Amino acid sequence: MAFAETNPATSSLPNGDCGRPRTRPGGNRVTVVLGAQWGDEGKGKVVDLLAQDADIVCRCQGGNNAGHTVVVDSVEYDFHLLPSGIINPNVTAFIGNGVVIHLPGLFEEAEKNVQKGKGLEGWEKRLIISDRAHIVFDFHQAADGIQEQQRQEQAGKNLGTTKKGIGPVYSSKAARSGLRMCDLVSDFGGFSERFKVLANQYKSIYPTLEIDIEGELQKLKGYMERIKPMVRDGVYFLYEALHGPPKKILVEGANAALLDIDFGTYPFVTSSNCTVGGVCTGLGMPPQNVGEVYGVVKAYTTRVGIGAFPTEQDNEIGELLQTRGREFGVTTGRKRRCGWLDLVLLKYAHMINGFTALALTKLDILDMFTEIKVGVAYKLDGEIIPHFPANQEVLNKVEVQYKTLPGWNTDISNARTFKELPINAQNYVRFIEDELQIPVKWIGVGKSRESMIQLF
């Protein structure tokens, strides 16, 4: 490798230059797929498309609170913890250190999908789990339920969590009392002692919590034997993948930008970073290896559970979107709240993530409308505000300024090219591109793989 020569004499640094050559680190780039709204945008479908020729598909954050649905050969597979790209028999699936793993949930999910079709045959041979990933225990899930109950009793409203133990396990992680995959597979005796301490801590915080410590450990020992062959040093694995022969590496974000612990509509968020920064911290890789960042955007907006939702349509429009879009959560089965597309929210998500292109999904759900509204600005006390408010009370008070566009009022589900879309549907897509200054790469007009129109 030839290095560019440096000349210490002409250095612009105040103390001269050490004379070492400076080169930008090379290696493969990862392609990232992230949710740009409140989740349920159709990330699984975009990942499924990209995973067809990928070598490695990764999850970097969250747990089995996420829900992705992928349809292959008319079989519908549901994923919560496993990267949905594992459905490709040539893919290595990697669960990074930022993911929290509920072992019974992992095996149950795999077994359910194995029974549905051939997509998951031999999954254990193609899954790698970072040894630094934290473990979700049953008592984390039980505590999650108790916390929700307490919030309901004390404040009259809960956070609407999935009760999968996500908040409690990330709390244990931050409090440095959590247990990781490396603890489980390295020394079960030491792991058992630390498990007992953590379980007893939880029992003292939640007196109604019942934990069968010995029974749990017995089960965990069984899981340990099954999981051990899959556990590897995740940092080393990914470094080798990035710096070895050319590979297509895909990162499948869970949840979405507005559910991010830092940038989402706090406190009605998840407990991890589901923006692009979570890719680096959740996999153990530097930012210069991040390549394309695809934002997945539903053609309208949905949200599960409570929290501010400026463009929500609590009326016939919202009901029509809910019914036509079959808007029920994959993980909880809860009805999703529905509203018009919100470009203020998307501009904010773009500021954080730097999307290189968008996938616009479920455009066909808007087929019935003669006119379609798009939120283009927020007003507070009659004045347009230039930012997305952090405070939930403020966000609840904003008045949305809409742009009304003509609908197409025709079935677009059989369109396979952009030109086959009605002119008003084309204009809707172009309007979004112009307002956000991000190109739309895919348009979803139905459930199947074939119904994703690729523009470039």
Curated annotation (Swiss-Prot):
GTP binds at residues 39-45, 67-69, 336, 362-364, 444-447. IMP binds at residues 40-43, 65-68, 162, 176, 255, 270, 334. Keywords: Cytoplasm, GTP-binding, Ligase, Magnesium, Metal-binding, Mitochondrion, Nucleotide-binding, Purine biosynthesis. Residues 1-26 are annotated as: Disordered. GO terms for molecular function: adenylosuccinate synthase activity; GTP binding; magnesium ion binding. One of its GO terms (biological process) is IMP metabolic process. Its cofactor is Mg(2+). The active site is at 40 (proton acceptor), 68 (proton donor). Substrate binds at residues 40, 330-336. InterPro entries: Adenylosuccin_syn_GTP-bd (IPR018220), Adenylosuccin_syn_Lys_AS (IPR033128), Adenylosuccinate_synth_dom1 (IPR042109), Adenylosuccinate_synth_dom2 (IPR042110), Adenylosuccinate_synth_dom3 (IPR042111), Adenylosuccinate_synthetase (IPR001114), AdSS_2_vert (IPR027529), P-loop_NTPase (IPR027417). The keyword Cytoplasm applies. This is Adenylosuccinate synthetase isozyme 2. It comes from Bos taurus.
